[in-house]
Amino acid sequence: MKLFIFLASIFLLTISAENCTKKKTGTVYKGRLEVKGLCMNYTISVIEGNIDPSLVEASWTDETTKKTYTNAFGLGSPCNFPATLNAGDEFYFSIDTTKQENCAVCMAYYPTPGKKIPIKVVVK
């Protein structure tokens, strides 16, 4: 009987510890890299998921190409965005609420939506 209680305790501790070490990911959205502009001036649109409308531009027109995008935002986290993603690529992301890293980004201009969101690309 003591062995059973001991083994049950070990099992419960193992399960509890596993839950404590799991990273909690926020809501995951599907996005598309619409414009891969110069110097990380990237425009992304939300194509799946119910994102807070106050975080994105309902409709935004690129003044260079005159193309209009819906649910668009500018990349707010250029330091950790994968260089392997190209314009037109779809990917999953969550809003990154951690402290943003500082990195060198050139100052060349390319138009982006006024609203910026720091995101983290996630594998789904």
Regions found by a protein language model. Give the residues of each.
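Bacterial Sec-dependent N-terminal signal peptides
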Residues: T14-V35
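Short aromatic-glycine-enriched beta-strand elements
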Residues: L38-G49
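Short, charged beta-turn/beta-strand-edge "cap" motif at the junction between a beta-strand
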Residues: D96-N102
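Disulfide-stabilized netrin-like
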Residues: V56-C79
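Short nucleic-acid-contacting surface segments enriched for D/E, G, S/T with interspersed K/R
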Residues: A72-F93
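Sec-dependent bacterial lipoprotein signal peptides
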Residues: M1-C20
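Short peripheral tails and domain-boundary helices/loops at the edges of structured domains
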Residues: Y109-K124
